[in-house]
């Protein structure tokens, strides 16, 4: 008898909300030449086919920077740059066109595969390329002629939408024509960024050699706001990094984010299944650039009762929290503050004020097990403290049996029962023997 594993079942169940959320949405995927050259590229193609099969409208933009550099070296043509931008003379343009054309055919062929025993079996994907992007020359800067290096003049977004409506994947490369019939070399990041903006895409997705943006300790930064992303760009450029996949993508992501693209995701092209893990799990695997954090701290309402109960029940069963009925929670819901991530309540706390004694109780503090190693507890404490001050309270107290040291680290000090509000003293459970700790809000 075959062993039955629930891992696949659990994973599929958790991914269903994201499958439903992404269906019919438009994503622009930026594939740099480094990603295409990597041995994991066939897996990325398979995952793109998977996204298409789930009803996601896809525009794939590819670059060819390393392939162009190799071809130039083979032909003994020295690459020329001005202000970190390639100068594309006539000889270089021919190399660019050859490299980009080869990649277009290769990507189209890979997406068109329909072999048995492959992820694209029976997919029958239509891949469409065309003159959707019209270019214009960069011109002359400081006396330097960029020749056939160009920038976008306009995008025929209506034509692209028609192809997406017909369930095709739109494939766009780094070479575009002008109204005069000339060809120009564009940067893939500009093409992807402007396409995402013009198409009003929900996501811009890019790849780099690392798992995303990393901090000083080497940990992945899961989320950046545009200003934070700009700081990262400046820090990388001070080290001489102007062309890495990370820098190029972050530049585009900041622009896209500020022009209406909801989220931009930076992933590793070396990690198998990175795009699937990023898009179909709550926490993802890379770095996303967003105008507004995926997590929201807000006051709870009646619709949050189910999520709060699901969060606190395990802690009540362990005796860490005092048991609350649904009815009690409904009556006290206005006292609660929650942290919500993708419609999941991941933390909560309540504030019960005793106005006459200018003190409040912080109670029912709970954090989802997957997020306890982070700073959600501190976020809740800060929010509850702010609410207490706004109410004119001078102190906060907690009753706890397990988290004594954590609260002491945050400035709470042990106290006796006579320091509690008179009403709370009468309700104190001597069998539970909770420790009493008090925070002076004016000494934070």
From Swiss-Prot:
Chain ranges of the N-acetyltransferase domain: 295-434
Record keywords, A-Z: Acyltransferase, Amino-acid biosynthesis, Arginine biosynthesis, Cytoplasm, Transferase
The species this protein was found in: Proteus mirabilis (strain HI4320)
Similarity section: Belongs to the acetyltransferase family. ArgA subfamily.
Name of the protein described by the UniProt record: Amino-acid acetyltransferase
Gene: argA
Pathway: Amino-acid biosynthesis; L-arginine biosynthesis; N(2)-acetyl-L-ornithine from L-glutamate: step 1/4
The EC number(s) this enzyme carries: 2.3.1.1
A Gene Ontology BP annotation from the UniProt entry: L-arginine biosynthetic process
One GO CC term, this protein: cytoplasm
């Amino acid at each position: 008898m075959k062993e039955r594993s629930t891992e696949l079942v659990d994973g599929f169940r958790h991914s269903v909300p994201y499958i439903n959320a992404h269906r019919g949405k438009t994503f622009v995927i930026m594939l740099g030449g480094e990603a295409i050259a990597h041995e994991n590229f066939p897996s990325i193609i398979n995952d793109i086919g998977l996204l298409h099969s789930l009803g996601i409208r896809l525009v794939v933009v590819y670059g060819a920077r390393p392939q162009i550099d190799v071809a130039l070296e083979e032909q003994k043509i020295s690459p020329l740059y001005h202000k970190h931008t390639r100068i594309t003379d006539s000889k270089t343009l021919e190399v660019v066109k050859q490299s980009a054309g080869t990649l277009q055919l290769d990507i189209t062929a890979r997406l068109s595969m329909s072999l048995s025993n492959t992820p694209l079996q029976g997919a029958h994907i239509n891949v469409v390329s065309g003159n959707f992007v019209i270019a214009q020359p960069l011109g002359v800067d400081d006396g330097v002629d960029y020749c056939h290096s160009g920038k976008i003049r306009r995008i025929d977004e209506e034509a692209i939408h028609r192809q997406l409506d017909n369930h095709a994947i739109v494939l766009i490369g780094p070479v575009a024509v002008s109204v005069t019939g000339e060809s120009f070399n564009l940067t893939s990041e500009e093409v992807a960024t402007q396409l995402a903006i013009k198409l009003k895409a929900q996501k811009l997705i890019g790849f780099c050699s690392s798992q995303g943006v990393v901090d000083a300790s080497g940990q992945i930064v899961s989320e950046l706001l545009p200003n934070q992303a700009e700081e990262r760009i400046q820090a990388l450029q001070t080290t001489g990094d102007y062309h890495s996949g990370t820098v190029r993508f972050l530049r585009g992501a900041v622009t896209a984010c500020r022009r209406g693209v909801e989220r931009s995701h930076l992933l590793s092209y070396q990690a198998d299944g990175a795009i699937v893990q990023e898009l179909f799990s709550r926490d993802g695997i890379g770095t996303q650039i967003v105008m507004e954090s995926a997590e929201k701290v807000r006051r709870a309402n009646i619709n949050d009762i189910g999520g709060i109960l699901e969060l606190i029940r395990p802690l009540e069963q362990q005796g860490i929290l005092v048991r609350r009925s649904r009815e009690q929670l409904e009556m006290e819901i206005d006292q609660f503050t929650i942290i919500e991530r993708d419609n999941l309540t991941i933390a909560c706390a309540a504030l019960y004020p005793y106005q006459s004694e200018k003190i409040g109780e912080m109670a029912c503090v709970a954090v989802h097990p997957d997020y306890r190693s982070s700073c959600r507890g501190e976020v809740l404490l800060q929010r509850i403290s702010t609410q207490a001050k706004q109410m004119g309270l001078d102190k906060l107290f907690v009753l706890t049996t397990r988290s004594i040291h954590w609260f002491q680290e945050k400035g709470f000090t042990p106290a006796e029962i006579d320091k509690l509000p008179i009403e709370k003293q009468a309700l104190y459970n001597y069998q539970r023997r909770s420790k009493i700790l008090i925070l002076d809000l004016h000494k934070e």
